[in-house]
Amino acid sequence: MSYALLRPFLFNMDPEHAHEMTLSLLDKAHKARVLGLVYGQSMQPTDCMGLQFSNPVGLAAGLDKNGDYIDALAELGFGFIEVGTVTPKPQAGNDRPRLFRLKQADAIINRMGFNNEGVDYLIENVQRCKYKGNIGINIGKNAATPVEKAADDYVYCLERVYPHASYITVNISSPNTANLRDLQSGEALTHLLDAIKNRHSQLATEYGFYVPLVLKVAPDLDPIQVDYISQQLLDFEIDGLIATNTTLSRVGVEDLPDGDQAGGLSGRPVSHISTQILQQFSDQLDGKVALIGVGGIDSGAKAVKKIEAGADMVQLYSGLIYKGPGLVQSCIQSIGGYYDAMEN
């Protein structure tokens, strides 16, 4: 069954239940060995952060928080999969309802709150999966951990996931964990990156191999914050930046049903602001830090916009919900066409 036929059925369901059902159906299709026949794998080889990717279009964190569906999702043609956000201990997240579709705007508001089964559960799934491509693991802090002790949670997760991840993303930009975004500014960011990078260097020595470290930031940053974060990335030799997470802005959706719900807004309305922030970081970092563009990509053309703004690779999430799995191939082909045109 095509996604276009399935979507009306899914969109009549509770969003979180529909999310769970979609992943379950995807897993069944994977086990029946039909996914690869439908979607296949487009090649657009990409080197980034010292890693080789089959193509530059990845799955953003949040869709498969616990790594339960890595093999099934990989068959949609992604060049890499990012799982999480995962925390040291399992946690239920915020109360339901916590996920809202804004259909008129092709947007989603979520206040999930890092619901996950804990880092050890995720590691078991990563070890069990058969996918041979790059897997990023996105780490966060437990809601019960005071922000002053956040570094302890991040370092704990870093230690646990290090030997199992292709790269590790430090998520300090979710708006749904109290005070988490405070870690993006001033001494809090410096203290966090210092603790993480010190342990990261030790782990590289202990294991004898290097796992790239990535920071994920919000789109709700002013130029001073962009400048400061950029300098911290350079000072601590962070390998990559994911720009961006969801926004607290409600511009363009404030009058829609559920447009005033608390949480982070993703989808089409965040496209412009996230691309602007990406461009600002690109200007500041001048190719010294790998950039992954995410936010509002619902077409191949939007993916190319991220590349034009300085992204080395892109990630999808909300666009998949509205456009379906065919979006992956569309983005790969559009990016490939863009690079071909640049060479000619």
UniProtKB/Swiss-Prot annotation:
EC assignment: 1.3.5.2
Enzyme class: oxidoreductase
Taxonomy, superkingdom: Bacteria
UniProt entry keywords in alphabetical sequence: Cell membrane, Flavoprotein, FMN, Membrane, Oxidoreductase, Pyrimidine biosynthesis
Gene Ontology biological-process annotations: 'de novo' pyrimidine nucleobase biosynthetic process; 'de novo' UMP biosynthetic process
Cellular localisation: Cell membrane
Keyword Cell membrane: yes
GO MF terms held by the record: dihydroorotate dehydrogenase (quinone) activity
Cofactor(s) annotated in UniProt: FMN
Catalytic activity: (S)-dihydroorotate + a quinone = orotate + a quinol
SUPFAM superfamilies hit by this protein: FMN-linked oxidoreductases
Major localization class: membrane
Membrane topology: Peripheral membrane protein
UniProt pathway: Pyrimidine metabolism; UMP biosynthesis via de novo pathway; orotate from (S)-dihydroorotate (quinone route): step 1/1
Residues given in the record as substrate binding sites: K65, N110, R111, M112, G113, F114, N171, N176, N245, T246
Gene Ontology CC annotations of this record: cytoplasm; plasma membrane
Presence of keyword Oxidoreductase: yes
Cofactor note: Binds 1 FMN per subunit.
Binding-site residues for FMN, renumbered to this chain: A61, G62, L63, D64, K65, T85, N138, N171, K216, T244, G267, G296, Y317, S318
The family this protein is said to belong to: Belongs to the dihydroorotate dehydrogenase family. Type 2 subfamily.
Complex and partners: Monomer.
Function, in words: Catalyzes the conversion of dihydroorotate to orotate with quinone as electron acceptor.
Protein name listed in UniProt: Dihydroorotate dehydrogenase (quinone)
The species this protein was found in: Psychrobacter cryohalolentis (strain ATCC BAA-1226 / DSM 17306 / VKM B-2378 / K5)
Organism taxonomic ancestry: Bacteria, Pseudomonadati, Pseudomonadota, Gammaproteobacteria, Moraxellales
